[in-house]
Amino acid sequence: MSVRSAEYPRPKHFLVHLSDTHLVAQGELYDAVDASTRLREVLSGIVASGARPDALIFTGDLTDQGHPDAYAELKAIVEPVAAEIDAQVIWAMGNHDDRSTFRSLLLGEDATDHPVDNVYDLDGLRVITLDSSVPGHHYGEISDRQLDWLRSELAVPAPDGTILALHHPPVPCIQDLAVLVELRDQSRLADVLRGSDVRAILAGHLHYSTTATFAGIPVSVASSTCYTQDLNVEVGGQRGRDGAQGCNLVHVYDETIVHSVVPLGAHVTVGEPVDADEGARRLSAAGIRILESEKAGRSIV
């Protein structure tokens, strides 16, 4: 029997994209949602799947009011999971976050109110977090100084390209009220990104999953882990709901990046369940193999 290789090898990099955890210091979020429990449920699903991402990337609104106790609980929930699956944690600021508390408690840095912009190297894949928050407001904006910094960072391409992570997505708002809190002056950001090695933009803020392109770059918005927006609401209206939470899987290949939505919750099994061993047996029986990517470092599961 001849052996055929699958059209694509395994991904070079694997990330999990989470957003809008909105943890509170005590009680339930808006007296309706246990945000901590929802986050634990999402992370438990990742661990149970056997997935081993390079990084967990959180795109802002990590707490609802920027309270130190909420950040402490966030670390207590996320860091043990990250250690268990050997994943780096990458935090980005959101409009509900507090810069000084974010810096001191999550990054271990001096508490300042300067924008929280950082660069991470994941075995050749560059991840840049860009702070789109405006203290005291819920809309997003990126300053001239930040844009100059970003342009400088992007001047030298990374071996496997760059992923930009920020809270406010540079996409059209399909809910009218969301225009109040959109990212402003987006064309200035587009001018910096156009022609760069940025391969994908990860964002949150909207509390529903969506995709678009910006300056020719794919944009992937992750739903919230705490509550989401009902997109079947009356046109022109808005309604949050305790449902449809989740995260996104981001598989990075040489020529493309795949973003996949993972909804929270267990559902009735349809058809025959197949475990990993049986899946491998069937591929072998069919004479198909999936090649490993040419990556120096950890293997992708």
Swiss-Prot record:
Fe cation 1 binds at D20, H22, D61, H207. Fe cation 2 binds at D61, N95, H167, H205. Its cofactor is Fe(2+). It is an enzyme of class 3 (hydrolase). Keywords: Hydrolase, Iron, Metal-binding, Nucleotide-binding. GO terms for molecular function: 3',5'-cyclic-AMP phosphodiesterase activity; metal ion binding; nucleotide binding. SUPFAM superfamilies: Metallo-dependent phosphatases. Binds 2 Fe(2+) ions per subunit. Its EC number is 3.1.4.-. AMP binds at H22, D61, N95, H96, H207. Belongs to the cyclic nucleotide phosphodiesterase class-III family. This is Probable cyclic nucleotide phosphodiesterase RER_40650. It comes from Rhodococcus erythropolis (strain PR4 / NBRC 100887).
